């Protein structure tokens, strides 16, 4: 399951998350 794997790039940051296809992306606030 790949969902959320990109979230790890922002560990320790406050993020806004959204799903796009099979991947979960987060943007730093």
Swiss-Prot record:
Q: Does the keyword Transmembrane helix apply?
A: no
**An MF annotation (GO) of this entry:** toxin activity
Tissues in which the protein is found: Expressed by the venom gland.
Q: Which residues form the LCN-type CS-alpha/beta domain?
A: 2-29
- Keywords of this entry: Ion channel impairing toxin, Neurotoxin, Secreted, Toxin, Voltage-gated sodium channel impairing toxin
Q: What is its main location?
A: secreted
One GO cellular component, as annotated: extracellular region
Q: Which compartment or compartments is the protein found in?
A: Secreted
Q: Which family, according to the similarity comment?
A: Belongs to the long (4 C-C) scorpion toxin superfamily. Sodium channel inhibitor family. Beta subfamily.
- Give the domain section of the comments: Has the structural arrangement of an alpha-helix connected to antiparallel beta-sheets by disulfide bonds (CS-alpha/beta).
What does this protein's UniProt record list under function?
Answer: Binds to sodium channels (Nav) and shift the voltage of activation toward more negative potentials. This toxin is active on crustaceans.
**What protein name does the entry list?**
Toxin II.9
